[in-house]
Design a protein with these regions (language model features):
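Conserved glycine-rich cofactor-binding loop
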Residues: 13-17
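Conserved glycine-rich Rossmann-like NAD(P)H-binding loop of the short-chain dehydrogenase/reductase
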Residues: 29-45
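The beta1-alpha1 cofactor-binding region of Rossmann-like NAD(H)/NADP(H)-dependent oxidoreductases
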Residues: 41, 61-73, 103
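Conserved mid-core segment of classical short-chain dehydrogenase/reductases
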Residues: 76, 85, 93-107, 150
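Active-site helix of classical SDR
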Residues: 121, 157
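Residue(s) in the substrate-gating loop at a strand-loop-helix junction
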Residues: 141
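SDR active-site lid
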Residues: 170-235
C-alpha cells in the first residue's frame, strides 16, 4: 500500500483491547486511520498515541455505534476519504442468564453486533467496489460455533457475524473486496470480565492469546484473501468440535465454574 495515496483504515472499538491493537498494526502498515469508540476521552488519547508513534493521520470519532443511525453517520464522517480497510471490531459481552432484565442489553448487542456491523459492511463494501477493491474484517468469535449457557445472546450474534461474513466473501470476491470473519477463542482483554490474574495465567498456559499477536496474524490472513480465520487453530479448532459433543450435564457443570471467575 502506497502511503502517499492516503488510504485509510476504519477501526471501530479502537480505544482499547483488540481494536486498539488493530489500529496500531494498520498504522505500522502505513495506513491512515479513522478510530471510533463511544468513549470520547479515551479515543482521542488513543488516536494521539498512534499518530505520535507511527506518524500517520488519525481521525478520532466518539460515536454510539448501537444507534440505528450510527452507520450512516460514520459513512458521512468518512466522506472524501479513501477507506480501503474496515475493521468491524466494536462489541459487548455479558455472561448472564436471560431474564426479564435482558431486553435493554438485547437491543444493545443486536445494535452493535448485527445492525450496525451489517450496515457498515454493506455501505463501505459498496464504496470499496467502486474504488476497485478493499478489505473488511468482521469480528466474530469461536463462541459463534456452539451453544453455551450464559452467553446465549453473545454466541447467537457472533454466529450471525460469521455466516454473514462468509456469505459476503463469495458475493464481494469478484469485485476484489475481501470479507473475512475473525473467530478467536479466549483473548487477554477486559471485555470478558476475567480478572487480570487469570488472563495472565491463561496466556502462560497457552489457552489465551495476546491481542497484539492475534491481530498481526489476522491482518496477514485478511490481506491474503482468507474467508475465515480461527487463531491458534491447533487449540481452537478441536475446542470448537469438542464443545459441540459435550453432554449437557458437563456443560452445566462448566457453566457454574465459569460464573465464579466473572467480576
Amino acid at each position: 500500500m502506497n502511503s502517499e495515496k492516503k488510504s485509510y483504515a476504519l477501526v471501530t472499538g479502537a480505544c482499547s483491547g483488540i481494536g486498539y491493537q488493530f489500529a496500531r498494526a494498520l498504522a505500522a502498515r502505513h495506513y491512515c486511520l479513522v478510530m471510533v469508540s463511544n468513549r470520547d476521552k479515551e479515543i482521542h488519547e488513543a488516536a494521539t498515541r498512534v499518530a505520535g508513534d507511527y506518524g500517520v493521520d488519525t481521525r478520532p470519532l466518539c460515536l454510539d455505534l448501537a444507534r440505528p443511525t450510527a452507520a450512516r453517520e460514520l459513512l458521512d464522517f468518512c466522506d472524501g476519504l479513501d477507506v480501503e480497510v474496515l475493521i468491524n471490531n466494536a462489541g459487548v459481552f455479558s455472561f448472564a442468564d436471560v431474564s426479564p432484565r435482558t431486553p435493554p442489553f438485547l437491543e444493545l448487542i443486536l445494535g452493535l453486533h448485527v445492525e450496525t456491523l451489517s450496515k457498515l459492511t454493506v455501505l463501505f463494501g459498496e464504496r470499496m467496489k467502486q474504488r476497485g477493491g478493499g478489505y473488511i474484517l468482521n469480528s466474530s468469535s469461536l463462541a459463534g460455533y456452539f451453544a453455551f449457557p450464559g452467553i446465549s445472546l453473545y454466541a447467537a450474534t457472533k454466529g450471525y457475524v460469521r455466516l454473514f461474513s462468509e456469505s459476503l466473501w463469495y458475493e464481494y470476491r469478484p469485485h476484489h473486496v475481501t470479507v473475512m470473519a475473525l473467530c478467536p477463542g479466549a483473548v487477554a482483554t477486559d471485555l470478558y470480565g476475567l480478572p487480570t490474574f487469570y488472563q495472565n495465567l491463561g496466556v502462560r498456559l497457552g489457552i489465551i492469546c495476546r491481542p497484539e499477536k492475534m491481530v498481526d496474524k489476522a491482518l496477514n490472513r485478511l490481506f491474503k484473501g482468507r474467508r475465515v480465520y480461527i487463531p491458534y487453530p491447533l487449540l481452537n479448532v478441536p475446542m470448537k468440535w469438542m464443545m459441540e459433543l459435550l453432554p449437557s450435564g458437563l456443560i452445566r457443570f462448566i457453566y457454574q465454574k465459569v460464573k465464579r471467575f466473572q467480576k
